[in-house]
């Protein structure tokens, strides 16, 4: 329960800041490409820091790494709120990205604390905390932005600091000492970490699916405020409440539905069905003429994401030894970060040069590819039938 609260409060801060980041960036430069590059910088620091934090959590435990990430988030949001120059804004983004390992470390914590049979449900609860944070965070950010653009970031900084103090007092350790393993520092760089997990033949295809799915998702998240403003004239408050709606959908899916569906259908069917929903609804986002219609479309997209991501993570985790869970989650974070380096920049270029719908049409195509790759790994001999049912 404490871990749920930790992730929830952390994601409130994240949810406050992320929908407003394009508007912070707009104080210093304009254009979708610049916003995309800023998102890519954040992801590049995640890419560098994720495997390092994962390795540290395998060596020293999950607790100290979680606390480090919370403290880093507090300082980064403080810098963002106080930024008066482009250099300080960039520094805030760099620090936020480098210490953004809370979710990956929490997933490793869940892997330590659950059986293989219960892992998808445990990861779904972490996803629900993520979603609840995205309900409260954007709504708070939208309201606070009416006061000033600095207020949301300063409030997020205070939340992260409070979370750090609370965690320091009450968070227990989950990673048992006999499972801890010293890893040479040179092996904690993201390139070698990616190379090692890609050598794990039993999860290689699924890791490719993780990359493709998150390329699509990263482009959507970073580009959506620009898309909604260009097509529907939405401003900060409208975007903030829309992100809150997405959070509600994530909570319903990952907090309730996946726990009911997983015993009945299993991770494989949930993953295939979720990917099919995501690909279809990304295309519908690109084609929708109305902001009102966007709500049910993105609601179904969030349902698909909420089914696919915990199921995919659980399948990969179940194929990995207990002593390597931290490095696995760090490696997954590196893949996510690589997607977030490329996704926002590519979405910005597509938006500026190919048109408003382009990032979402490309995202739908990438998700179809993820569905094909997943089917080839999980459904040998049944791929065609499974794809037909999805």
Report residues per predicted region.
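C-terminal transmembrane helical hairpin of 12-TM major facilitator-type secondary transporters
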Residues: 268-312
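Cytoplasmic helix-loop-helix junction between adjacent transmembrane helices
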Residues: 92-131
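Juxtamembrane intracellular "pre-TM" segments in multi-pass secondary transporters
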Residues: 172-208
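Residue-level signature of mid-helix packing/kink "hotspots" within the transmembrane helices
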Residues: 15, 43-51, 101, 134-135, ...
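Conserved MFS/SLC helix-loop-helix module at the cytosolic interface between two early adjacent transmembrane helices
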Residues: 47-86
């Amino acid at each position: 329960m404490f871990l749920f609260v930790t992730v929830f409060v952390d994601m409130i801060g994240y949810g406050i800041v992320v929908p407003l980041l394009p508007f912070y960036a707009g104080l210093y430069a304009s254009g979708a490409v610049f916003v995309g590059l800023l998102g890519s910088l954040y992801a590049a620091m995640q890419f560098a820091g994720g495997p390092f934090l994962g390795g540290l959590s395998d060596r020293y435990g999950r607790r100290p790494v979680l606390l480090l990430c919370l403290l880093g988030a507090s300082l980064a949001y403080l810098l963002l709120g106080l930024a008066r120059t482009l250099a300080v804004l960039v520094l805030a983004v760099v620090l936020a990205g480098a210490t953004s390992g809370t979710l990956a470390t929490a997933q490793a914590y869940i892997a330590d604390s659950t059986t293989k049979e219960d892992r998808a449900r445990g990861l779904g609860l972490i996803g629900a905390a993520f979603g609840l944070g995205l309900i409260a965070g954007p709504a708070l950010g939208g309201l606070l932005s009416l006061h000033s653009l600095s207020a949301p970031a300063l409030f997020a900084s205070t939340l992260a600091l409070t979370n750090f103090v609370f965690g320091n007092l009450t968070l227990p350790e989950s990673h048992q000492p006999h499972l801890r393993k010293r890893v040479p520092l040179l092996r904690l760089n993201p390139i070698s970490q990616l190379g090692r997990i890609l050598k794990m033949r039993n999860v290689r295809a699924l890791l490719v699916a993780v990359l493709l799915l998150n390329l699509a998702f990263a482009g959507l998240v970073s580009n959506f405020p620009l898309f909604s403003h260009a097509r529907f004239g939405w401003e900060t408050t409208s975007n903030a409440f829309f992100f809150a709606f997405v959070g509600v959908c994530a909570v319903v899916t990952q907090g309730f539905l996946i726990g009911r569906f997983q015993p009945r259908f299993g991770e494989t069917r949930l993953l295939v069905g979720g990917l099919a929903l995501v690909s279809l609804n990304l295309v519908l986002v690109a084609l929708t003429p109305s902001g009102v219609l966007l709500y049910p479309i993105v609601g179904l997209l969030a349902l698909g994401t909420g089914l696919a991501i915990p199921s995919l993570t659980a399948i990969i985790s179940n194929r990995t030894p207990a002593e390597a869970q931290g490095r696995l989650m760090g490696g997954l974070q590196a893949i996510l970060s690589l997607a977030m380096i490329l996704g926002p920049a590519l979405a910005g270029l597509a938006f500026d040069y190919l048109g408003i719908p382009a990032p979402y049409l490309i995202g739908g195509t990438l998700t179809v590819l993820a569905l094909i790759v997943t089917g080839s790994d999980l459904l040998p001999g049944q791929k065609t039938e499974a794809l037909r049912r999805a």
